[in-house]
Amino acid sequence: METTEELSTFLTAATVDGILGRLLYRGAAWSLMRKNGVLPQNAPPLGATIETDLAEHGFALLRGAMALRAQAGASELTGKAFERAANAFEALVRNGDPESPDRGFRRTIAAAAYHLAGFSAVAFSIFNEIEEDLNVSPGEIAIRHLILRDLDQLRGFVRDWLNYGAHGDEQIAAALQGGDADVDEVLSTILNTTICRALAFFDFALETGEVESFEAARGLLTTAVGLADNAENVPLWWISNLCRHLIDDLWQHSLHQNLPTEPPEGAEERYPDLRRLFISSLYARKTSEVELWPSQREAAQRSTDVTDDLVVALPTSAGKTRVAEIAALMTLSSARRVLIVTPLRALSAQTERTFRKTFAPLGFGVSSLYGASGLSAGDEDALRTREI
């Protein structure tokens, strides 16, 4: 096993811009120029072995990043390595051969690596733009649902897989004892079942906040990684290992872990229930919202302190509204009201809809107050009576 210093040295060298004859730049151009995996005849020379080079470079970066993250935790270096690995695998699948047997495997790796690099929106788009026929394993399908935050689909898929008779422990044991079973096929079934069972535990952890369920999921995936290693099942070793890092990352940045359990002063009675309802309502959305984005984390942490003053300057779509929602949650739990001032009427309407969607399930009213033609009696009433 390499030391942390050795892994850091390797990844620092492997992520230098323009390494290997600008391989990643050539790979991006190669993927954009081709159609169904075939380059046009007038394409410039991008390297006869570019596909092999991209795969080898991507796997090397991915292995090193996972190993360093396991030893020393996430860092700027591991994030950069995951991003460069994702670039390599994205180049391998974009506009690729639709009949390639490993197209689904490589796409899953690209999306997972982007997610671990902190680019969950890019990971989402890697999966959201494709058709269903990807030649993927059950474990890869489950990871796809997790990355797309379609937890209803994830729950249904793993339930169906785990309830299918041939995937039960007794049936698998009987097949092995019968002597007629293909051992590699049985091991693949065991590994996919373990991944699905782990994600069932993890889904429950995201729903309830139970640390024990997260630890059970992580333990199952650690077992799967060891079994895949011993069985020399290379694809499922990558998938189970990536899945373990994915749930680590998601849990670390989940709302359960980042919204304080200790209530603000004076909110001891209301805050625990409001916190639970807030997280549950976001989890229950069609596209579940279970974690904080990298752009939100520092501001969100400060917004939980009701004694703090805060100005948050972030680009469009970087998640400012979620920070405001967390600040509002802490304020409302202290039995105080929230006033939102926006510079545009259109933004007022959008913010009103967003806050109503979030806070109506918690029992709070959101006013419609735009002030276009002075202050009416109804406006005065809204200011006096509405919580937001």
Residue ranges and their predicted role:
Residues M1-I388:
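N-terminal helicase ATP-binding lobe
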